[in-house]
C-alpha cells in the first residue's frame, strides 16, 4: 500500500556530536573529502546505501551507533578538527578580502552580488539541475565561496527536481519524477524573529496571489535561496508552479520565471533583513530566465524612492550583468506577447501593472520586444536591463554579438557590446582525489589557482602519471559494469542472462567518453554514421577502443529520445556490447567517474552551436585528452598538443554530407592518431608520448579551466565596474541617474534628426603612402544636442569589392567650430594605418561619462 503523505524525521544527535549537524547541512562537505570520509566512518555500508548523503545517513543510522561514536575519542577528535576547519573556512579572509585589504580595489569591489539562475547543480543530493547551465551555476557558487566573494544566489526549489531516466526494453527513454522532501535535504527554512516562515508574494492576474516560502541551502560561504510554491497558502494550481524543472507548458514556465525574478528579488530583501546583511549592489542574471528581476528592481525604485521609470531603469542597468548561454535564437525563451500582457497589463484601468504596481504596463512589455511583434523575448529584456553582458567563451562572445546585432542596428557585429568570460569548473568537485593529492604534494597546499603549481608536474615520473590514469580507468570500469547490470535488470533482463557483464569493458583498453544533454546539435549519433567502421574500431585486436555514452533528452523531445534509442540498439548487439554502453540517468555522480576515468573526451557539436562545453574541461582537469570539434572553449585553448581537433566542414550546406565528412574525420583520428599513441609502450609499459600529452594538458589547461579563474574574471571585469556604476547612479539622491536618464531621452529624441551633411578629406598626396596624413572634416547637424553630447569618429579600414570596411579602426574627431545654419564642424588628422584598398566614413555616437561604452544605447548616424 502507498503512504498518504511522506515526510522526513531527522535523528536526534547526542550533544557531543552536535557538530555533525552543521557539517551535514553546509554543502561544503560535497567538495571536502575529509568531511566525506568522516561521514563514511559512521557506517560505511549505510553511507553507500544513502548515496553519500550526510543528512540521509544521520536520519537512518542506528541511534546506538551514534551513542557509541559520542564516546569514541578518535572520531570526536576528527569531528572537532573538521568543525573547526569549517568555521575557519567560513570566517577567514580569502582572495576577495585580500583584494579589499589592498586598498585601491576595495573601493571598486561590490559589497554584495545577487546571482540568479533557474537551476543549480551543487551536489547530487540537491537535484535542482538538468545539464551544463545548472552545473556551471553550482560551480560558480562553490568557487565564489572558495574565493570569499559575497554572493547570494537565488533559484527555485523543485519538489520533483529533474527526472530520473531509465530505458525500456527497446531502448526508449522513460522518465520518472522523484518526490523530494525538503526536510530530508541540507536545507533550512527562512523564518522571521517569531519563528514563522518568511513568505514572498507576487500578484498575478484574476486577483490570484502566488506565495512562496524560502529554503536556504548553505554552499560554503554562499547562501542559495530556493523559492517553493508548494504551500497551503496557495491555491492548488499555484502550488504546482515549482513542481519540476522544465516540466510544463509555456504558462507554467512564465509563472516560474516571474517567481524567480520578481519573487527572487523580494526573497533577497527578506533574507538580508532577517540576517541583517547589506543588500547586494550588483545583480547577475545567469541567462534570461530571471529577467523579471530587473523590472522588480525598477518597481522598488519607483515605489520606494519616487523615481520615474527611466531614472529607475538607469540605476538598474548600471548594476546588472547579463550572461547569455545560448548560441542560437531557438534556445531563447520567447513567450506569446498576449500571454505576457495578461500577467503585466492594466488590471485596474489606469495603465498600471498589477504584477508590478506603479509601473506602466506598456513600458514593461517594450523591454521584451523583438522583430516578431507577437513575441516577448526574455534575452532581449535581459540585454535591455543590463549595462554589461557576456557570452561564455571567446567564440560564443562572437556568435552572441552576431545573434543580437539587431539590438544595435547600424553597428558591425564586432562592435556589439557583449563581451565574454570563458566558463570554468570547480576543481575540488571534479578533480579525482589522486590528482588533488598530487597537487597538494607539489604545492604544499590546496591552492591550484597559480599556474606555477601546474608547471611543477614536470617533476613527476611519467610512470606515476600513468599509474594514476590507469587506477582511475579501473574505477570507472567497475562503476560501468554495476550501472550496466542495473540498467539491464530494469529493462527486464534476468541475472542468468547477464554473466557477460562481469568481463564487459576492460581496464586496459583505450576508453572514450561522450556524455551530455541530447539536443540535436550535439549530434549524439555522429559516431554511428558508419556502424561497420565504428565496430571495427571497437573490436580491433591490436588497438581496441571502448566507448561509454550517457545523456538525457528533454521529456518532450521525441527526436532526442530517438537518437538515444539508436545508440542503445547498437550497444545492445552481442558482438559489441562489451565495448560500448549507454548508461541511463546521467547525473553528477556518474559524470564524476566518467571525467576521472575516460582517456579521451569526445565532443562533436555542429560548430558554432556549442556555447562552451565544460564537460571537456572536467576531463582535462583529470588528464583526459579532448577529441573535439573546434567549438566553445576548445576553439580558444586547443594548441595541438593537448588533444585532437576534429575538422569541421563549416562550408558544407548539406547536413548529411557534413555529418558524413566529420564522422569520417573522427574515425580516421581514432584509428590513425589516438589509438596508436595510447598503445605505444616503453619497456616499463608506459605510453610515453601519451603521458606527455597528459602532462601538457594538465600544465596548460589546468589553471585555465578553473572556475576560480572564471569568478575572478567576473569580479574584475563585470562586478567591480557594475558596482562603481551603481554607486554613481544611486548616490546623491540619484542625481546622476536622473542626469543620465535625461540625456538618454534627449539623445533618443534628437537622433532621428541628426545628419552628417558633408565630409571633406584633404592632405593626401596624389599617390597615398602608408603613413600619409589624412585630414577629415565633417559638417554635422546635431538637432539640439551640444557638441560635447556626441562623439564624432572617422572610421578607416580596408575595403572589400563591395566597399565594406574590413577590420576598421576609429579616430575621434575634435569639435573645431560652428558653421552656417548652426551646423557643427568636427575634424581630425591621422596617418593612414593600412596599405592596399582603403576606405573611410564618418559616424556620430552618443557621449556621456556614465555610459559604459559609446555604442551602449544602440544609437549611431553614418555618413
Swiss-Prot record:
What biological-process GO terms show up in the record?
Answer: glycogen metabolic process
What family does the entry list?
Belongs to the glycogen phosphorylase family.
Instruction: Return any one Pfam family short name.
Output: DUF3417
- State the Gene Ontology terms under molecular function: glycogen phosphorylase activity; pyridoxal phosphate binding
Q: What domain of life is recorded for the organism?
A: Bacteria
Protein name in the entry: Glycogen phosphorylase
What biological function has been recorded for the protein in this entry?
Phosphorylase is an important allosteric enzyme in carbohydrate metabolism. Enzymes from different sources differ in their regulatory mechanisms and in their natural substrates. However, all known phosphorylases share catalytic and structural properties.
What catalytic reaction does the record list?
Answer: [(1->4)-alpha-D-glucosyl](n) + phosphate = [(1->4)-alpha-D-glucosyl](n-1) + alpha-D-glucose 1-phosphate
Modification type N6-(pyridoxal phosphate)lysine: residues: 618
Q: Which species is listed as the source?
A: Mycobacterium tuberculosis (strain CDC 1551 / Oshkosh)
Q: Which cofactor does it need?
A: pyridoxal 5'-phosphate
Instruction: Return the EC number.
Output: 2.4.1.1
Q: Which UniProt keywords apply?
A: Allosteric enzyme, Carbohydrate metabolism, Glycogen metabolism, Glycosyltransferase, Pyridoxal phosphate, Transferase
CDD domains given in the database record: GT35_Glycogen_Phosphorylase-like
Q: Does the keyword Transferase apply?
A: yes
Keyword field contains tRNA-binding: no
Amino acid at each position: 500500500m502507498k503512504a498518504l503523505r511522506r515526510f522526513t524525521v531527522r535523528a536526534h544527535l547526542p550533544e557531543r556530536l552536535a557538530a555533525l549537524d552543521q557539517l551535514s547541512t553546509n554543502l561544503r562537505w560535497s567538495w571536502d573529502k575529509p568531511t566525506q570520509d568522516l561521514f563514511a566512518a559512521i557506517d560505511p555500508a549505510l553511507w553507500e546505501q544513502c548515496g553519500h548523503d550526510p543528512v540521509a545517513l544521520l536520519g537512518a543510522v542506528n541511534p546506538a551507533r551514534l551513542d557509541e561514536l559520542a564516546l569514541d575519542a578518535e572520531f570526536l577528535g576528527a569531528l572537532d578538527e573538521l568543525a573547526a576547519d569549517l568555521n575557519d573556512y567560513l570566517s577567514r579572509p580569502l582572495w576577495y578580502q585580500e583584494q579589499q585589504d589592498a586598498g585601491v580595489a576595495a573601493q571598486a569591489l561590490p559589497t554584495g552580488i545577487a546571482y540568479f539562475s533557474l537551476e543549480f547543480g551543487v551536489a547530487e543530493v540537491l537535484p535542482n539541475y538538468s545539464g551544463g547551465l545548472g552545473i556551471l551555476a553550482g560551480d560558480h557558487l562553490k568557487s565564489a565561496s572558495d574565493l570569499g566573494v559575497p554572493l547570494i544566489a537565488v533559484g527555485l526549489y523543485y519538489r520533483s527536481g529533474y527526472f530520473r531516466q531509465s530505458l525500456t526494453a527497446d531502448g526508449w527513454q522513460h522518465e520518472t519524477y522523484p518526490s523530494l522532501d525538503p526536510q530530508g535535504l541540507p536545507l533550512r527554512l527562512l523564518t522571521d524573529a517569531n519563528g514563522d516562515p518568511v513568505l514572498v508574494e507576487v500578484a498575478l492576474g484574476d486577483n490570484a496571489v502566488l506565495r512562496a516560502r524560502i529554503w536556504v541551502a548553505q554552499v560554503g560561504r554562499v547562501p542559495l535561496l530556493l523559492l517553493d510554491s508548494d504551500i497551503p497558502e496557495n491555491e492548488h494550481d499555484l502550488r504546482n508552479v515549482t513542481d519540476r524543472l522544465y516540466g510544463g507548458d509555456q504558462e507554467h514556465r512564465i509563472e516560474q520565471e516571474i517567481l524567480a525574478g520578481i519573487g527572487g528579488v523580494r526573497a533577497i530583501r527578506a533574507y538580508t533583513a532577517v540576517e541583517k546583511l547589506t543588500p547586494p549592489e550588483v545583480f547577475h542574471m545567469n541567462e534570461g530566465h530571471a529577467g523579471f528581476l530587473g523590472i522588480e528592481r525598477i518597481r522598488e525604485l519607483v515605489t520606494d524612492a519616487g523615481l520615474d521609470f527611466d531614472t529607475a531603469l538607469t540605476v538598474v542597468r548600471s548594476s546588472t550583468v547579463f550572461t547569455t548561454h545560448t548560441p542560437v535564437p531557438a534556445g531563447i525563451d520567447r513567450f506569446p506577447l498576449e500571454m505576457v500582457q495578461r500577467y503585466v497589463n492594466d488590471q485596474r484601468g489606469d495603465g498600471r501593472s498589477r504584477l508590478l504596481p506603479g509601473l506602466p504596463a506598456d513600458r514593461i512589455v517594450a523591454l521584451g520586444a523583438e522583430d516578431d511583434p507577437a513575441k516577448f523575448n526574455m534575452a532581449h529584456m535581459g540585454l535591455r536591463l543590463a549595462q554589461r553582458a557576456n557570452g561564455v567563451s571567446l567564440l560564443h562572445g562572437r556568435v552572441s554579438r552576431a545573434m543580437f546585432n539587431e539590438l544595435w542596428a547600424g553597428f558591425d557585429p564586432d562592435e556589439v557590446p557583449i563581451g565574454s568570460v570563458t566558463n570554468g569548473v570547480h576543481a575540488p568537485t571534479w578533480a579525482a582525489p589522486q590528482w588533488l593529492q598530487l597537487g597538494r604534494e607539489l604545492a604544499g597546499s590546496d591552492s591550484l589557482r597559480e599556474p606555477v603549481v601546474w608547471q611543477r608536474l614536470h617533476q613527476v615520473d611519467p610512470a606515476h602519471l600513468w599509474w594514476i590514469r590507469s587506477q582511475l580507468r579501473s574505477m570507472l570500469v567497475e562503476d560501468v559494469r554495476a550501472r550496466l547490470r542495473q540498467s539491464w535488470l530494469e529493462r527486464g533482463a534476468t541475472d542468468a542472462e547477464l554473466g557477460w557483464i562481469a568481463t564487459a569493458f576492460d581496464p586496459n583498453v583505450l576508453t572514450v567518453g561522450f556524455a551530455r544533454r541530447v539536443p540535436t546539435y550535439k549530434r549524439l549519433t555522429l559516431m554511428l554514421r558508419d556502424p561497420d567502421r565504428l565496430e571495427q574500431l571497437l573490436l580491433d585486436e591490436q588497438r581496441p577502443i571502448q566507448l561509454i555514452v550517457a545523456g538525457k533528452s528533454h521529456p518532450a523531445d521525441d527526436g532526442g529520445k530517438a537518437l538515444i534509442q539508436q545508440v542503445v540498439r547498437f550497444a545492445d548487439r552481442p558482438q559489441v556490447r562489451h565495448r560500448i554502453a549507454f548508461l541511463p540517468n546521467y547525473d553528477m555522480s556518474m559524470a564524476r567517474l566518467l571525467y576521472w576515468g575516460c582517456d579521451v573526451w569526445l565532443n562533436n557539436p555542429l560548430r558554432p552551436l556549442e556555447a562552451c562545453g565544460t564537460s571537456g574541461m572536467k576531463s582535462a582537469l583529470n588528464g583526459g585528452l579532448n577529441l573535439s570539434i573546434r567549438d566553445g572553449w576548445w576553439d580558444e585553448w586547443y594548441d595541438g598538443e593537448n588533444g585532437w581537433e576534429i575538422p569541421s566542414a563549416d562550408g558544407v550546406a548539406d547536413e548529411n554530407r557534413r555529418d558524413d565528412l566529420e564522422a569520417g574525420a573522427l574515425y580516421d583520428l581514432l584509428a590513425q592518431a589516438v589509438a596508436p599513441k595510447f598503445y605505444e609502450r616503453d619497456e616499463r609499459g608506459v605510453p610515453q608520448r601519451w603521458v606527455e600529452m597528459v602532462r601538457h594538458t594538465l600544465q596548460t589547461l589546468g589553471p585555465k579551466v578553473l572556475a576560480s579563474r572564471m569568478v575572478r574574471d567576473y569580479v574584475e571585469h563585470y562586478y567591480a565596474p557594475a558596482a562603481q556604476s551603481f554607486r554613481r547612479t544611486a548616490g546623491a539622491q540619484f542625481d546622476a541617474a536622473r542626469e543620465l536618464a535625461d540625456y538618454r531621452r534627449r539623445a533618443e529624441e534628437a537622433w532621428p534628426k541628426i545628419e552628417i551633411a558633408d565630409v571633406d578629406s584633404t592632405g593626401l598626396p596624389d599617390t597615398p603612402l602608408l603613413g600619409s596624413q589624412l585630414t577629415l572634416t565633417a559638417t554635422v547637424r546635431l538637432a539640439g544636442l551640444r557638441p560635447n553630447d556626441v562623439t564624432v569618429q572617422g572610421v578607416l579600414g580596408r575595403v572589400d569589392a563591395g566597399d565594406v570596411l574590413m577590420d576598421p579602426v576609429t579616430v575621434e574627431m575634435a569639435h573645431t567650430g560652428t558653421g552656417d545654419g548652426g551646423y557643427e564642424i568636427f575634424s581630425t588628422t591621422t596617418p593612414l594605418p593600412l596599405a592596399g584598398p582603403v576606405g573611410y566614413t564618418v559616424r556620430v555616437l552618443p557621449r556621456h561619462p556614465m555610459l559604459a561604452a559609446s555604442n551602449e544605447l544602440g544609437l549611431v548616424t553614418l555618413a
